[in-house]
């Protein structure tokens, strides 16, 4: 796990564990496509292969379709606004969890603005905690990730 963290790819590790453990299992094609892309990307990272920008772009597009807005907007959204956005949706927990991981990914990509980096990371952790508290299924992987992120600040 330290290798993944040191490379800034813990968001992929989290998503693969979430998706493979069935926490976000859905029957629609969009989620299955996201699962395939995330799994392929995570395998590439773990095998020390370079991730193609085309794969990341495709993942971004699918995530945008799933969340219902451009993923870059996550950086400017308030955590409560995001939670409220999906309050009445059946798959709200999955969408909030996906958004939280994306915020963590963005925090790893930001280098020049330390305040933005910190905000994105904190928002991602807050959303993960919310998901852990509100989800009907307890996730050991999610709990470990939250603890690791809080310790690694």
Task: Show where each model-derived region lies.
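Short, Lys/Arg-enriched N-terminal segments with co-localized hydrophobic residues
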Residues: 3-23
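Short coil/turn connectors between adjacent alpha-helices in alpha-solenoid helical repeat scaffolds
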Residues: 45-56, 107-119
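Mid-chain, well-packed structural core segment of small domains
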Residues: 92-113
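Amphipathic alpha-helical binding modules
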Residues: 113-153
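"A position-specific structural signal for the A-helix of alpha-solenoid helical repeats
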Residues: 35, 98-105, 144-148
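A conserved position within tetratricopeptide repeats
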Residues: 45, 63-67, 71, 107-111, ...
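N-terminal alpha-helical interaction modules that lie
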Residues: 16-96, 151-153
């Amino acid at each position: 796990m330290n290798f993944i963290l040191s490379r800034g790819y813990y968001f992929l590790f989290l998503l693969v564990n979430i998706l493979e453990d069935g926490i976000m299992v859905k029957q629609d094609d969009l989620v299955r496509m996201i699962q395939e892309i995330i799994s392929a990307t995570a395998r590439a990272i773990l095998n020390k292969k370079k991730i193609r920008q085309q794969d990341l772009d495709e993942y971004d597009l699918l995530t945008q379709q799933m969340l219902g807005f451009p993923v870059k907007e996550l950086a400017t959204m308030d955590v409560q606004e995001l939670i409220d956005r999906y309050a009445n949706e059946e798959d709200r927990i999955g969408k909030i969890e996906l958004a939280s991981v994306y915020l963590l990914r963005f925090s790893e990509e930001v280098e020049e603005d330390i305040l933005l980096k910190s905000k994105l990371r904190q928002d991602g952790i807050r959303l993960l905690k919310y998901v852990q508290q509100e989800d009907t299924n307890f996730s050991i992987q999610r709990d470990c990730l939250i603890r690791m992120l809080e310790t690694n600040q």
